[in-house]
Structures are given as C-alpha cells and as structure tokens.
C-alpha cells in the first residue's frame, strides 16, 4: 500500500527483498539510504515519482525489473545508485539534480532515453558506461566537464551535442560509441583525454576544437569509417596512436603548426594514399606509418624539408607541394 507519512528509508532497509514487486507511493520521502533496495530483482513499481528525495549510493543497484523512473524532483543521486538495472528503459527527468554520483546508471543496458538533466557542471565518470541502448540524452548548457568513460560503449548513441560551455572532455568519454555518425567538438574545449573517441567506428567526419594545442593519444583510433578529420588551428604534434586503425582515411593534410609526428600515429591506416607534410615538421617517429601500404602512399613535401629527407631515407614515394 501507500506510505503517505514515510520520510526516511534506512540504509539496506529492503536489501535483497527478493519477493518485493511494488513499493507504494511515498510522497514525503526525503532520503533513501545506501543499498536500500539493492538486488530487489522483482521490483517493478516504485512509488517515488516526483518526490524530492536524496538517493544514496547503490540504493537501487541491480533492481533488474524496473522499467521507468521519474526523478524530476530528486536533487542528489549517489554513486552506482541505479547501476545494473538491466531492464530500465526511461529516466523521465533529472531536471532538479545538483549532485550525481559516478557510475550512477552504469550498465543499464536497456536504457534508451534520459530526460532533461539539471544544471550540473560535471558529468561524472562512467555515469552512462555500457548503456548500450542509449539513444536520447541532452547535456545542459551549464556542463563544463564530461568525465572519464561517461558514455563508454554506448553503442546505440547516434548523435551527441556537446554544449559550448564544455571545456574538458576526459579520457575514454565517448570511447566505443559505435553509432555516432559525426563528431563536432566545440571550440570551448581546451583539454581532452586519451582515447576520447577511440572506436567510434561509424563516424565519417570528426572536427576537433580550434584552440586545442595537442591531440590526445589514440584520440580517434579505430574510427574505421572516418574520411575527414578537421585539425585544431594551433596543434603542435600528432600524438601516439592518434589515427591508429583509421582504415578509410585516404588523404590528409597536416597543418603547418605541427612539428612532430609521434609513435605509430598513423599505424594501420591501410587506405592512406596521400599525405601532405609541411616544412614545420622536424621529427617523425620511425614507427609513425607502420602498417600503411608504402607502395601506394605518396608524401607531398617541401623541397629541402625534413619530410623530404625522411621520405628519401625510408623509400617513400614523394612529390613536391605546388
């Protein structure tokens, strides 16, 4: 039945209550303790729609029968609060949220839609990791940081709009988002972690922000269908493994701000047939083009440049830039 006067649910209060299928309406609840409903695997109906509660860590972890949640008035969600809720399909709203714990919805593999997210400045680490069906999520324009692996292996995510309030995208944030078609990083972003878009194999075009001065390691590795990459304006080096496994990339022009091409930067770019290397480049790692088809690859170089000398020494076909 309903629980009209209940205000507080203790830590582990219903933990492993394997026969619990319904928790009645509790409109006055303000706090749900840590592990309160952990592994209530038959719990389908939760009478907390619209309540202004704080939800503790792992409060609903592995509640594998929940399908929809309205968290529109919830202000705080703890770490792993809803992780491993494998049948959860919809989170109607997170519009009042001011504190969201890391891994909060990790491995909610049926989760398709997340409603409006409140005015967070940071999206926590691994918050939607392995949400393999996630297709609809909108980030607020207060967002400044997208945390480590926040969307890692969200295989179904077809697009993401990164607000121009974001300045930092941490490592692996979108790694393995295999349905993303185009990736445009706003110019507000000045810091990006390694492998940030690695394995986004369906993306055909990737645009990095103008003011980034470096390329993160393995940044777009295994973006199998990428045919166009737009460099930052002041980038100084092509980092380790950055284009590794970009097997559809045919031509690329390296900006004249670049001085270094690092370890295996273009490893296994097997379709690469033409690369323009400016006179600004003064160092190319001996492994930078490992796995490329040397007999089909033409370097476009400046007469007397380091790139020309390197091409001659290593038996690459080269022509002079016009």
Q: Model-flagged regions — what are they?
A:
Residues 313-315:
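Short, structured coil segments at secondary-structure junctions
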């Amino acid at each position: 039945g309903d629980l009209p006067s209940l205000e507080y649910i203790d830590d582990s209060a219903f933990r492993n209550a394997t026969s619990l299928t319904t928790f009645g309406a509790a409109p006055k609840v303000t706090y749900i303790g840590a592990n309160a409903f952990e592994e209530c695997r038959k719990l389908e109906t939760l009478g907390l729609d619209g309540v202004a509660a704080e939800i503790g860590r792992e409060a609903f972890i592995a509640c594998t029968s929940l399908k929809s949640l309205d968290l529109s008035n919830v202000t705080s969600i703890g770490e792993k609060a809803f992780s491993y809720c494998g049948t959860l399909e919809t989170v109607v709203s997170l519009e009042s949220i001011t504190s969201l714990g890391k891994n909060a919805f990790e491995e909610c593999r049926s989760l398709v839609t997340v409603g409006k997210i409140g005015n967070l400045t940071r999206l926590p680490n691994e918050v939607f990791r392995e949400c393999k069906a996630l297709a609809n999520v909108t980030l607020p324009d207060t967002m400044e940081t997208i945390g480590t692996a926040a969307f890692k292996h969200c295989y179904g995510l077809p697009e993401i709009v990164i607000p121009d309030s974001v300045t930092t995208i941490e490592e692996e944030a979108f790694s393995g988002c295999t349905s993303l078609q185009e990736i445009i990083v706003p110019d507000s972003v000045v810091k990006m972690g390694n492998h940030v878009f690695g394995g986004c194999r369906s993306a055909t075009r990737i645009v990095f922000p103008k003011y980034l001065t470096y390329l993160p390691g393995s940044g777009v590795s295994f973006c199998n269908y990428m045919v166009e990459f737009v460099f930052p304006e002041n980038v100084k080096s092509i980092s380790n493994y950055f284009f590794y496994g970009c097997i559809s990339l045919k031509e690329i022009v390296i900006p004249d701000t670049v001085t270094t091409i690092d370890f295996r930067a273009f490893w296994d770019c097997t379709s690469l047939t033409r690369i323009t290397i400016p006179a600004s480049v003064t160092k190319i790692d001996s492994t930078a083009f490992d796995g490329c088809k040397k007999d089909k690859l033409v370097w476009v170089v400046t007469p007397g440049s380091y790139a020309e000398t390197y091409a001659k020494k290593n038996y690459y076909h080269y022509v002079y830039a016009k």
